[in-house]
């Protein structure tokens, strides 16, 4: 079977057929160069939808509503605000989220159950509902507004995060696109910051949920910036079927290509989030192979990527590789240190548990790159995994010390 997956250079959330979006400044965030803080994603036709949500016990109101509405056979729109998380706001916050959904549904001439919702920003503050309801009614939807959607969901992000791919499989073509936000409070667990994915492929609801979970497990669930899991983490996917392909519904060759394309989209967005970590200068990629199991590989990769000591060492270009081993050792994974090989880039600094005498000045110079790859081979089995993180700088402390002031 012939197939191809191509990344489109100027792709956006509205690249797949039938999707439109619009964004506006509603006065939720402080006025800045990015004067957008409210956006709607809309499909011309009903969509099969899937979602994954935060495991944090302190969940925001929009998470509960979206989780409930995803229980219906189809959905058609997502309303998103940035600048206010609508978390820790009690019954009033829940009522605000419901009102946002109702206003969006009325404006788009659909039922509230058709609308999903997400919020991001400061915890503990009420939404300015009069401004939001008025702004929802003013939003103009267009296929051309895809990049505005990615900008409107940003908070402390320094850049928007979006991607689109075109997939060709033996005579038919479809697109998958995505946008995400996140720079701080990034340490997902069976969830993600805020992520939105669209496709014009025809996909069964059960398979869409399965495929999204598979993609999240090797992308959003493998990044960390600061070890904090957000109260609002949500990942959504809408599939409207306008590509008119044979419906992807299970373990077929077509479905495998769909999964590969979705993995590419999710990993690209996840790496963009890690790269844009608050105050970060370097993306850190942790590759673990030769583990006794996949779970052990994931445990080690995430532990090393999230270690404050590893992150600060990378920031200071300090080749203190003992910190990497210490993080691996506390991960809960099983391994024998006398079998471990450790590489910083192409330089092997540890062979079968013994230091190799690699030149530390050369290693320090290499650590000043914008992308740092650290590889551990446990030489035990076939388990392998990759995680992403970023360096930890004084700027991260400054950003978060001043966040609400």
UniProtKB/Swiss-Prot annotation:
It comes from the Bacteria. GO terms for molecular function: glutamate N-acetyltransferase activity; L-glutamate N-acetyltransferase activity. Its EC number is 2.3.1.35, 2.3.1.1. It catalyses: N(2)-acetyl-L-ornithine + L-glutamate = N-acetyl-L-glutamate + L-ornithine; L-glutamate + acetyl-CoA = N-acetyl-L-glutamate + CoA + H(+). Substrate binds at residues 155, 181, 192, 278, 400, 405. CDD domains: OAT. It holds the Pfam family ArgJ. Pathway: Amino-acid biosynthesis; L-arginine biosynthesis; L-ornithine and N-acetyl-L-glutamate from L-glutamate and N(2)-acetyl-L-ornithine (cyclic): step 1/1; Amino-acid biosynthesis; L-arginine biosynthesis; N(2)-acetyl-L-ornithine from L-glutamate: step 1/4. Heterotetramer of two alpha and two beta chains. Belongs to the ArgJ family. This is Arginine biosynthesis bifunctional protein ArgJ. It comes from Dehalococcoides mccartyi (strain ATCC BAA-2266 / KCTC 15142 / 195) (Dehalococcoides ethenogenes (strain 195)). The lineage of its organism: Bacteria, Bacillati, Chloroflexota, Dehalococcoidia, Dehalococcoidales.
């Amino acid at each position: 079977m012939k197939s191809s997956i191509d990344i489109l250079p100027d792709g956006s959330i509205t690249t797949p057929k039938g999707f439109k979006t619009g964004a506006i400044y509603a006065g939720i965030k402080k006025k800045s160069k990015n004067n957008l803080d409210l956006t709607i994603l809309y499909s011309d036709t009903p969509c099969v939808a899937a979602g994954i949500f935060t495991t944090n016990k302190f969940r925001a109101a929009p998470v509960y509503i979206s989780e409930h509405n995803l229980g219906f056979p189809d959905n058609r729109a997502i309303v998103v605000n940035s600048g206010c998380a609508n978390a820790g706001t009690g019954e009033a916050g829940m009522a605000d989220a419901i009102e946002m959904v109702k206003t969006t549904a009325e404006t788009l001439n659909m039922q509230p159950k058709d609308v999903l919702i997400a919020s991001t920003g400061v915890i503990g503050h009420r939404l300015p509902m009069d401004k939001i309801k008025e702004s929802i009614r003013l939003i103009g939807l267009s296929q051309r507004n895809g990049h505005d959607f990615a900008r409107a969901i940003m908070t402390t992000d320094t850049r928007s995060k979006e991607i689109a791919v075109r997939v060709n499989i033996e005579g038919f073509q479809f697109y998958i696109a995505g946008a995400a936000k996140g720079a701080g409070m990034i340490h997902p667990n069976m969830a993600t910051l805020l992520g939105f994915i669209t496709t014009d492929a025809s996909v069964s609801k059960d398979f869409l949920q399965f495929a999204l979970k598979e993609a999240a497990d090797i992308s959003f669930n493998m990044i960390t910036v600061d070890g904090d899991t957000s109260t609002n983490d949500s990942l959504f996917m809408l599939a409207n079927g306008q590509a008119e392909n044979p419906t992807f519904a299970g373990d077929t060759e077509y479905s495998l290509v769909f999964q590969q394309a979705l993995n590419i989209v999710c990993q690209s967005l996840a790496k963009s989030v890690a790269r844009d970590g608050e105050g970060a200068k370097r993306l850190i990629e942790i590759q673990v192979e030769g583990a006794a199991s996949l779970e052990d590989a994931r445990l080690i990769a995430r532990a090393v990527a999230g270690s404050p000591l590893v992150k600060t060492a990378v920031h200071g270009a300090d080749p203190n590789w003992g910190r990497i081993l210490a993080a691996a050792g506390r991960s809960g994974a099983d391994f024998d240190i006398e079998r471990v090989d450790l590489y910083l880039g192409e330089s092997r600094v540890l062979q079968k548990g013994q230091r190799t005498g690699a030149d530390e000045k050369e290693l320090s110079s290499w650590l000043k790159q914008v992308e740092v790859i650290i590889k551990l081979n446990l030489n035990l089995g076939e388990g392998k995994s990759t995680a992403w993180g970023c360096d930890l700088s004084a700027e991260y402390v400054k950003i978060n010390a001043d966040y609400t002031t």
